[in-house]
């Protein structure tokens, strides 16, 4: 693992859930503006942040097994060097695992959905199925897939509340994503996040 960067916990701002739900859309076009570290922090916390001293997170997890790992390809975030980072929820920090950003490679592996390459960040949500299946057997696969859906919705809602756009991308070649990131977990979802073109 590379350098560790602590990222500030988000300030919780008042926003009506109903407003965010009404405004939530899938967005595939992003302008060239960078994200701020604060915005990155909010997105990661919403995805899988720790919410209390017992280790519970922002999403429900069968038996609190928390089988997911969140990686983020950083192309353009103010104050953060480009590269691929792993999110460490327990410390609300990111650790760089690749020195270069791989947005173009991710886009090609995702059936040439090139908007992925343009996004300032791309979340890669991957699963270590064994954390859940060793407790629940084959039913654990279902629970893992439910959990990634919870993460995706949280990212959608946080992005919307910040005036950003995102989309869930499930069309990609799994093994290519694993090879690009050099990870052992199984990728389930890509979520590019950026500023919407108005």
From Swiss-Prot:
Organism phylogeny: Archaea, Methanobacteriati, Methanobacteriota, Methanomada group, Methanococci
Gene3D superfamilies xref list:
NADH Oxidase (3.40.109.10)
Give the enzyme class.
Answer: oxidoreductase
A GO molecular-function annotation: oxidoreductase activity
Q: Which UniProt keywords apply?
A: Flavoprotein, FMN, Oxidoreductase
Q: What is its EC number?
A: 1.-.-.-
Q: Which cofactor does it need?
A: FMN
SUPFAM superfamilies membership = FMN-dependent nitroreductase-like (SSF55469)
Organism (species): Methanocaldococcus jannaschii (strain ATCC 43067 / DSM 2661 / JAL-1 / JCM 10045 / NBRC 100440)
User: Know the name of this protein?
Assistant: Putative nitroreductase MJ1384
Decide whether keyword Nuclease is in the record. no
């Amino acid at each position: 693992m590379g350098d560790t960067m602590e990222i500030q916990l988000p300030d919780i701002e008042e926003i009506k859930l109903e407003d965010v739900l009404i405004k939530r859309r899938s967005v595939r076009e992003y302008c060239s503006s960078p994200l701020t570290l604060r915005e990155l922090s909010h997105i990661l916390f919403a995805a899988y942040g720790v919410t209390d001293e017992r280790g519970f997170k922002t999403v429900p997890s069968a038996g609190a097994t928390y089988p997911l790992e969140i990686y983020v390809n950083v192309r353009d975030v103010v104050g953060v060097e480009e590269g691929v980072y792993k999110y460490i929820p327990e410390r609300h920090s990111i650790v760089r695992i690749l020195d270069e950003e791989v947005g173009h490679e991710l886009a090609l592996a995702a059936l040439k959905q090139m908007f992925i390459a343009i996004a300032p960040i791309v979340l890669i949500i991957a699963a270590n199925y064994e954390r859940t299946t060793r407790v629940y057997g084959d039913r654990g696969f279902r629970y893992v897939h439910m959990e990634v859906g919870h993460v995706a919705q949280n990212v959608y809602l946080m992005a919307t509340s910040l005036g950003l756009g995102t989309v869930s991308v499930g069309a990609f070649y799994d093994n290519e994503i694993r090879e690009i990131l050099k990870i052992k977990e199984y990728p389930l979802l890509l979520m590019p996040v950026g500023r919407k073109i108005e």
